[in-house]
C-alpha cells in the first residue's frame, strides 16, 4: 500500500496542472463526471475483453479487493487513464455537471481514439485487445511483455 499517500498527492498535482489550480477530483462537475464516464467506458471494454479471453476478472495483480469483481480490469485500466484525461481535456468546455447526450456520444467514441500499440497506429479498443492478449501470453509463458498503448504525439 501507499502509506505516505504519495500516489494521492501526485494525482492532486497532476489533475490541477491539467485542469487548473481550482480543480478537485471527485467533485460533481463537468470534468469529473466526464472523466468518470470515460473511465467506465474503457473499463467496460476491458471487462468484456477479459471475459472473451476467459480470464477471471476478480483475480487482480495490484487490486485485490474482496468486494470488487473487476480487480483485474482496474489493474489494466491504469495505462488508459492518461489517454482518457487528455481526451476529456479536449472535449469538456463548460461547467454543466450534467453530461449532454452529445458529450456522452463523444466520450463513448474514445474507443475509436487513435493510439500506438506494438509500434502501429490502432484504435484504443483494439489496443485493449492487444493488451489482454499480451497479458494472457505473459501468464502462460512467464515472460513479461505487455503491449501498453502510447499516446500519439
Task: Kindly give the residue locations of the regions a language model identified.
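Active-site helix-to-loop segments that bind/position phosphate- or nucleotide-bearing substrates
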Residues: 1-153
Amino acid at each position: 500500500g501507499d502509506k505516505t499517500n504519495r500516489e494521492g498527492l501526485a494525482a492532486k498535482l497532476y489533475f490541477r496542472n491539467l485542469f487548473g489550480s481550482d480543480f478537485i477530483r471527485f467533485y460533481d462537475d463537468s470534468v469529473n463526471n466526464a472523466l468518470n464516464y470515460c473511465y467506465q467506458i474503457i473499463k467496460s471494454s476491458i471487462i468484456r475483453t477479459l471475459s472473451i479471453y476467459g480470464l477471471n476478472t476478480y483475480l487482480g495483480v495490484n487490486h485485490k479487493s474482496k468486494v470488487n469483481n473487476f480487480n483485474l480490469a482496474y489493474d489494466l485500466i491504469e495505462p488508459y487513464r492518461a489517454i482518457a484525461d487528455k481526451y476529456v481535456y479536449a472535449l469538456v468546455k463548460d461547467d454543466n455537471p450534467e453530461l449532454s447526450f452529445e458529450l456522452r456520444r463523444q466520450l463513448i467514441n474514445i474507443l475509436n481514439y487513435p493510439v500506438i500499440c506494438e509500434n502501429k497506429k490502432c484504435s484504443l479498443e483494439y489496443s485493449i485487445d492487444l493488451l489482454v492478449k499480451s497479458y494472457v501470453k505473459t501468464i502462460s509463458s512467464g515472460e513479461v511483455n505487455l503491449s501498453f498503448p502510447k499516446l500519439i504525439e
